[in-house]
Amino acid sequence: MKDGFIKAAAGTPDVRVADCEFNATEIIRMVHEMEEQGAKVMVFPELCITAYTCGDLFWQENLLEEAKVQLVRIAEETADVDALIFVGLPLEYKGKLYNVAAGLNHGEILGFVPKINLPNYNEFYEARYFTSGENLDGTVHIDRDVYRARYESDTESDDVEFEIEMSEFDGFEELEELEEDEEPDYIDENDEEEDGELYEEDIWISPNMIFTCEEMPKLQIAAEICEDLWV
């Protein structure tokens, strides 16, 4: 922070349609470039893990699973980056497909924010594939050991080990939607093994989340995807 301001960055990585591994590699590369420039909030395009133009491939289970594998990879390979990072992916929840932004910080997947307003005109066909996330409120279970094993089986790199340390911008957490006069209830979405190693998570999915910094309580960030900003 300088003079009460933080630096935000928007990145547009090169992507290949349905090539989640390539796209994740580009996202990770850009995160580290942004880090070198001092960015503390990093925003990537909607559906950047799969690419936006997958069409009917969005219905392929293999694509949806690989998107989650690469989301875990992005989270873990940027665990040492002191920033709040948003990336986009398709996410299946209770039999329906959502266009979501995932908030990441220090290796944690903090929450999924679903898109509400789905364009279905001209060259846009989002309603063909996705469901509006309006009024959605629940948790998505992510077994990180399973997804970690999948991407590590395709690489010779060492295991990614990290700790979540207190720092100026550590500890973005999600807030549930608050009723009137209700006090904020911080969510601890992480299940841990006895040795403290992150094992699995139940991660909130809702359009009504605010990401706030523990060290700077007045820094509160919401995510809106494309048309949600102006409709």
Where are these regions (language model features)?
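Enzyme catalytic cores with a strong preference for nitrogen-chemistry domains
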Residues: M1-V231
